[in-house]
Amino acid sequence: MNTVLSVQGASAPVKKKSFFSKFTRLNMLRLARAVIPAAVLMMFFPQLAMAAQGQDLMASGNTTVKATFGKDSSVVKWVVLAEVLVGAVMYMMTKNVKFLAGFAIISVFIAVGMAVVGLK
């Protein structure tokens, strides 16, 4: 008769690496070796780095974006409706009031964000 012994879990404790172990001297040298050439190129060619002489390639789509996501668009209404439905369902599932009030907070963030970018 053969008996099988099974062990659940790891056989040896696994030590978790610290977040700060990524900031070693060797990793910082590798980062500097990658960043310094780009910084030197931007210093010698600032017009390419800052696009000082360029034209706005997205200006032609500005009216389309305002029509799609503007003040009276149906996309905004559908997003708000989806927020309300998801908040209600999550509240019913968890009985946590945070989910119920979450749609109001997200709606405020969306309204402020649209005002900042000029869509309202």
Swiss-Prot record:
Ranges annotated as spanning the membrane: 74-94, 99-120
Membrane topology reported for the UniProt record: Multi-pass membrane protein
Alphabetized InterPro entries for the sequence: TraA (IPR008873)
Propeptide: 1-51
Subcellular localization(s) per the UniProt record: Cell inner membrane; Secreted
Periplasmic side: 1-73
Modified residues (N-acetylalanine): 52
A cellular component annotation (GO) from this entry: extracellular region
Keyword line: Acetylation, Cell inner membrane, Cell membrane, Conjugation, Membrane, Plasmid, Secreted, Transmembrane, Transmembrane helix
Cytoplasmic side: 95-98
Subunit structure: Monomer. Interacts with itself to form filaments; also interacts with TraQ.
General function of this protein: Propilin is the precursor of the pilus subunit, pilin, that forms conjugative pili, the filamentous surface appendages required for cell-to-cell contact during the earlier stages of bacterial conjugation, and that retract after contact is established. Mature pilin is assembled with the help of TraQ and TraX.
Family as reported in the entry's similarity comment: Belongs to the TraA family.
Designated name of the protein: Pilin
Organism name: Escherichia coli
Classification lineage: Bacteria, Pseudomonadati, Pseudomonadota, Gammaproteobacteria, Enterobacterales
